Amino acid sequence: MQVQDDGVNLIPFAKCSRVVSRSPPPRLPSQSLRPMPQRYGDVFWKNLNQRPTPTWLEEQHIPPMLRATGCSQLGLYPPEQLPPPEMLWRRKKRRPCLEGMQQQGLGGVPARVRAVTYHLEDLRRRQSIINELKKAQWGSSGAASEPVVLGEEGCGFPSTNEYPDLEEERATYPQEEDRFLTPGRAQLLWSPWSPLDQEEACASRQLHSLASFSTVTARRNPLHNPWGMELAASEE
């Protein structure tokens, strides 16, 4: 590193690092006198220094017949019992009789068809049990089989005046309604409702009621109606 006459380095941030020397740590006398343990014995180093013998390079002699068939032991699989190569290489044909027995069950009915029929029978049996329980608890109610009639006052909800027995059933059996549902009951609880249709119906009803209210007020008090005021002014 070049130094100027005034003793300032050319590169101000470069400084000469100090030379540090470390002495080896002092060892105990027991460690210095004890010999280092050898991982490998003398036999290993002796065999490593020797040249490889020709027996190492020789391959294990395997008969050509056993090498082709893959059998390592003599007499285990004699070649006379093996099938010919063309029989081993060709594709196996499916047996139609076994396929028909697997796919078809008793009476020549396929297994999938039998499973579906069993499932449908189970569903019918469960539905019949549910209907019997409902008849025992609620009896035969004629209101449950009637369709939903939307009232003009309520937006999509049946009026209580038309179905008074529904309110009695709800008050008497509030918890059993969710457990068992007949198709008629489900029709009462569910209706093809959409928010757009409902909003349009409510808006049309509000406009109709507003128009009727304005006509009634105009007839009663024509001075408050702007059209009535114009007519009154023209007549005067």
From Swiss-Prot:
One Pfam family matching this protein: INCA1
Keyword Nucleus belongs to the record: yes
Compartmental location: Nucleus; Cytoplasm
Residue segments, region Interaction with CCNA1 and CCNA1/CDK2 complex: 75-99
Residue numbers bearing the Phosphothreonine modification: 182
UniProt cross-references to InterPro entries, sorted A to Z: INCA1 (IPR026238)
Top-level taxon of the source organism: Eukaryota
Name the record gives this protein: Protein INCA1
Annotated source species: Homo sapiens (Human)
Protein encoded by which gene: INCA1
